[in-house]
Amino acid sequence: MGKGGGCVPSKKKKPATTGDGPGIDDDNDATNAPIQIDDDQTTIDGDRTTATNTGGTTTPAITTTAAKISSPLKIFVVFYSMYGHVESLAKRMKKGVDSVEGVEATLYRVPETLSQEVVEQMKAPVKDLEIPEITAAELTAADGFLFGFPTRYGCMAAQMKAFFDSTGSLWKEQSLAGKPAGFFVSTGTQGGGQETTAWTAITQLVHHGMLFVPIGYTFGAGMFKMDSIRGGSPYGAGVFAGDGSREATETELALAEHQGNYMAAIVKRLAQP
């Protein structure tokens, strides 16, 4: 105890120091992946794991079975898109997921709740029938999710909400608990809900016990480009649709691809024994 009641470090044990973390490199996808935590080194011996700290002493670790991943990890990109804006992000997001070894993405549409007559009156384009509709029961086969939807008054569209409402049986059994998920959105204007549409959707994950995975600022310099209008936020990728005629820019699509890559890295990390 020092003068004035302040604590001073022991002479025998110096406080640990940490080095500077890696910087952001826009041309290197590896730096956009989650930063590895190496304070403790974990080694696998047969079917048991042992954690060894940096001081060279062995400490007890939770006994686990070293699971051998024989098939690719699956990320379901589940979306609703009336005019194709969310769909364009979804397809680019799949590219990002598939770029990570050992992880693959599958695109799914949620069912339309509007009648065909209403859809035609709204002049919505024909849906891509090569992308199948998904049922709630199929969600259990995924290791992670990326949900995409347009905004309606700052919240997810009714079609996506109806799909989440159909997952009651999964909620009852907590079948999706512990699985990571992220969001991507489409709004008409800059103030139309790029952030609120995502964070109001988090409640769907909470009740299922799922893990929300935002992208933060892992996209690096692309998150700070101000030379042109750009959708997307720390919550996830996004696109501005305007009056419906505006298409996603390359920056918006690149952010979607990055989110797919980032989510794949997270899912892969969580699957490690």
From Swiss-Prot:
The kind of enzyme this is, by top-level EC class, is: oxidoreductase
Q: How is the cofactor bound?
A: Binds 1 FMN per monomer.
One Gene Ontology term, aspect cellular component: plasma membrane
In terms of superkingdom, the source organism counts as: Eukaryota
Q: Which UniProt keywords apply?
A: Cell membrane, Flavoprotein, FMN, Membrane, NAD, NADP, Nucleotide-binding, Oxidoreductase
Q: Where in the cell is it found?
A: Cell membrane
Specify where it is mainly localized: membrane
The residue ranges of the Flavodoxin-like domain are 75-263
Binding-site list for FMN: 81-85, 183-236
The protein's required cofactors: FMN
Q: List every stretch annotated Disordered.
A: 1-60
Per the UniProt record, which EC number(s) apply here? 1.6.5.2
Q: Recorded GO terms, molecular function? A: FMN binding; NADH:ubiquinone reductase (non-electrogenic) activity; NADPH dehydrogenase (quinone) activity
- Catalysed reaction per UniProt? a quinone + NADH + H(+) = a quinol + NAD(+); a quinone + NADPH + H(+) = a quinol + NADP(+)
Residues where NAD(+) binds: Y83
* Low complexity bias locations: 49-60
- Family per record: Belongs to the WrbA family.
Q: What does this protein do?
A: Catalyzes the transfer of electrons from NADH and NADPH to reduce quinone to the hydroquinone state.
Fetch the NCBIfam families from UniProt.
flav_wrbA (TIGR01755), PRK03767.1 (NF002999)
In its UniProt entry, what is this protein called?
Probable NAD(P)H dehydrogenase (quinone) FQR1-like 2
Provenance organism: Arabidopsis thaliana (Mouse-ear cress)
